Structures are given as C-alpha cells and as structure tokens.
Design a protein with these regions (language model features):
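Short alpha-helical elements
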Residues: 1-180
C-alpha cells in the first residue's frame, strides 16, 4: 500500500512541475489518546496523554513522505530517527529537514546527517506565551488537522501499531484521490 501512496504523491508533484521526490521535509509528531482495548500505548509526559505518537515527514504540499507510529513514551527525537531509518529510500534526495524545538540537540542533528545528507533546521518560537505562525511549520500542522477529519483517527482504537499506520495511510490516500 505504501508504494501506491508514494506513487500518487510523486505524480501530484510532477503535475505541479516539481521533481517526483522532495528535497525539503518538515518533521513533527502528534500524540493521540487510545482506548482501553489498545495494548500498544505509552504515556507522553509532556502532553499528559496515554496513547501513541504519529510521526510525519511532509513535503511542501503537506502530503507525507514518510509516516511512523510509536508508543507515546518514545521521544520526538527517537521517533524521528526511527522514521528516517525505516524510510531511507524516501530521504535519499532530502537536503533540508525542518523540525520544531522538541528535536533540539547536536546528537539528533548528527544522527540525521549520518543517515541522510540532510541539514537539520530547528525552528523556535521567540516568545513562549504568545501565539505566532512560524513560516512553513503550519504545513505539517495542516496535515495533522486533515487527519482530524476522519472520525476513526480522533482516538486510536487499533490493537497494533501497524494497523494505525495503515489507517493514517488510507486517510491520506482518500484525501489525495478526493482532490485529484
């Protein structure tokens, strides 16, 4: 299923006059609550959520280049490294990776550089308690909000992480097919 999804995204990029593969990705994670039936859940202390994390790497249109699902107790940095590790083919041509302040640290940047040739840009907010739109970061937040349109993804009801991954992939496939 992932190969078909990647083909649809590549076709969409070609129609826009871009290359099939992107050289710029934005990476972020979203914590999602789980139901009582779910066995694969962890506790995200930062957001105080017991559940899973969806790690996404999106291109400039907001469509995923890679998706990875982990328990919520996995840090954003470790989840992003796993995301890149399991999807190395998608990150071959990536030159720049934009992340938020949850991914700070020289070790993270070095690990990403050793896996790919991408340069990591950490975008931070200037004022802690003031809302401001950070340029290009809204693209990944929009992608997460698209997932909110699918009732099944509001809360994780799946027993296996791989099933959650497939549900997220199906939601993005439906979104792409609906638009084009």
């Amino acid at each position: 299923m992932n190969s078909g999804f990647k083909k649809i995204v590549a076709d969409r990029r070609l129609r826009q006059g871009r290359s099939a593969r992107t050289s710029f990705v934005i990476v972020d994670a979203q914590s999602v609550k789980t139901t009582d039936l779910t066995k694969n859940s962890g506790y995200d202390g930062g957001k105080k959520i017991s559940g899973i994390k969806r790690h996404l790497a999106v291109e400039i249109n907001g469509f995923p280049q890679a998706i990875h699902i982990t328990r919520a107790n996995i840090t954003d940095r470790d989840g992003a490294i796993a995301l890149v590790t399991f999807n190395l083919e998608q990150f071959k041509l990536v030159r720049t990776m934009m992340v938020d302040s949850g991914y700070t640290g020289q070790n993270f940047a070095n690990e990403i550089s050793s896996l790919t040739s991408a340069k990591v840009i950490v975008v931070k907010r200037n004022e802690l308690h003031q809302f401001s739109v950070i340029p290009q970061r809204w693209l990944i937040e929009r992608s997460f909000s698209w997932l909110g349109n699918y009732h099944r993804l509001w809360r994780n009801c799946e027993r296996k992480l791989n099933t959650s991954l497939m549900m997220v992939s199906l939601a993005f496939i439906r979104l792409l097919l609906k638009r084009y």
